[in-house]
Curated annotation (Swiss-Prot):
<dbReference type="InterPro" id="IPR036895">
    <property type="entry name" value="Uracil-DNA_glycosylase-like_sf"/>
</dbReference>
<dbReference type="InterPro" id="IPR018085">
    <property type="entry name" value="Ura-DNA_Glyclase_AS"/>
</dbReference>
<comment type="similarity">
    <text>Belongs to the uracil-DNA glycosylase (UDG) superfamily. UNG family.</text>
</comment>
<feature type="active site" description="Proton acceptor">
    <location>
        <position position="61"/>
    </location>
</feature>
<dbReference type="GO" id="GO:0005737">
    <property type="term" value="C:cytoplasm"/>
</dbReference>
<dbReference type="InterPro" id="IPR002043">
    <property type="entry name" value="UDG_fam1"/>
</dbReference>
<dbReference type="Pfam" id="PF03167">
    <property type="entry name" value="UDG"/>
</dbReference>
<protein>
    <recommendedName>
        <fullName>Uracil-DNA glycosylase 1</fullName>
        <ecNumber>3.2.2.27</ecNumber>
    </recommendedName>
</protein>
<dbReference type="GO" id="GO:0004844">
    <property type="term" value="F:uracil DNA N-glycosylase activity"/>
</dbReference>
<keyword id="KW-0963">Cytoplasm</keyword>
<keyword id="KW-0378">Hydrolase</keyword>
<dbReference type="InterPro" id="IPR005122">
    <property type="entry name" value="Uracil-DNA_glycosylase-like"/>
</dbReference>
<comment type="function">
    <text>Excises uracil residues from the DNA which can arise as a result of misincorporation of dUMP residues by DNA polymerase or due to deamination of cytosine.</text>
</comment>
<dbReference type="GO" id="GO:0097510">
    <property type="term" value="P:base-excision repair, AP site formation via deaminated base removal"/>
</dbReference>
<keyword id="KW-0227">DNA damage</keyword>
<keyword id="KW-0234">DNA repair</keyword>
Length: 221
C-alpha cells in the first residue's frame, strides 16, 4: 500500500501501459484541445492528499467544453456556468441537508476536506465525450481503486450511474460503505437520484467511524 499519491504516480509511471497512455494523451494535445490541462489532469490528488481521503465520488468523463474541466469530477471553474448534473446534485443537497445551492460549481472545498472527486477517464478531446476512454485510463483507475480498497480507514464510495458502479466493482473490502445510485444527469435523476440522501448517509457513516463529517456547504461564508 502506498502512503502518498506522489508515490502511487511514481509507481504507475514505470509501467508500460502508463507510458503508452501518457504518450497518447501528449499526441492528442499536439493535435487539438484536450481537457483538463496537463497541470490539472491529476489535481484531485493534489487537493485531496492520500492520507486525508474519506469519500470517493466517481465520475465518468471530464467535461469536454472549453474552460470547464479542471481535474475534479462534476466540478467546474468558478466563473463557468453550472452544468445540469451538478445543478441536480445541488438540488439533492438542498433536499437532503437543507443546504442552499451555491452560485458556482467549484467543488475544491469538498476535495480539501477529503472528498476524492475522480473520473474513470482522466482526459477528453474538446467536444468529443468519451474520446479517451480506450487509451488506458481504465487500468489506471482500477489501480487507484485498488489502493483505496486496501485503505486503512473506512471510506465512503458514492457511485452514481451504471458506469461508476461497474468501474468500482473491485471495491470489496467490507469496512467501506458503498452508496450506489442513479446518475444525476437530467435524463436519469428523476428515476431515483432525487431523494436518495447520499450526503447525510455519508456523514452518518463518517461520524459512526469517528471521522469528521464533510461540510457540504459551498456558499461563501
Amino acid at each position: 500500500m502506498v502512503k502518498t499519491w506522489e508515490e502511487f504516480l511514481k509507481q504507475e509511471a514505470k509501467q508500460p501501459y502508463f507510458i503508452e497512455l501518457m504518450e497518447a494523451v501528449k499526441d492528442a494535445r499536439a493535435k487539438g484541445n484536450v481537457y483538463p490541462s496537463e497541470e490539472d489532469m491529476f489535481s484531485c490528488f493534489r487537493l485531496c492528499p492520500y492520507n486525508q481521503v474519506k469519500v470517493v465520488i466517481l465520475g465518468q468523463d471530464p467535461y469536454h467544453g472549453p474552460g470547464q474541466a479542471h481535474g475534479l469530477s462534476f466540478s467546474v471553474q468558478k466563473d463557468v456556468r453550472i452544468p445540469p448534473s451538478l445543478r441536480n446534485i445541488y438540488k439533492e443537497l438542498k433536499t437532503d441537508l437543507d443546504i442552499e445551492p451555491a452560485d458556482h460549481g467549484y467543488l475544491a472545498k469538498w476535495a480539501e476536506q477529503g472528498v476524492l472527486l475522480m473520473n474513470t477517464s482522466w482526459s477528453v478531446e474538446e467536444g468529443k465525450a468519451g474520446s479517451h476512454k480506450k487509451l488506458g485510463w481504465a487500468t489506471f483507475t482500477d489501480h487507484v481503486l485498488e489502493e483505496l480498497n486496501n485503505y486503512d480507514k473506512p471510506l465512503v464510495f458514492i457511485l452514481w450511474g451504471n458506469h461508476a458502479i461497474k468501474a468500482a466493482s473491485g471495491i470489496t473490502n467490507p469496512q467501506h460503505l458503498i452508496i450506489k445510485g442513479v446518475h444525476p444527469s437530467p435524463l436519469a435523476a428523476s428515476r431515483g437520484f432525487f431523494g436518495s440522501k447520499p450526503f447525510s448517509k455519508t456523514n452518518a457513516f463518517l461520524e459512526e467511524h469517528e471521522r469528521k463529517p464533510i461540510d457540504w456547504d459551498l456558499n461563501e461564508q
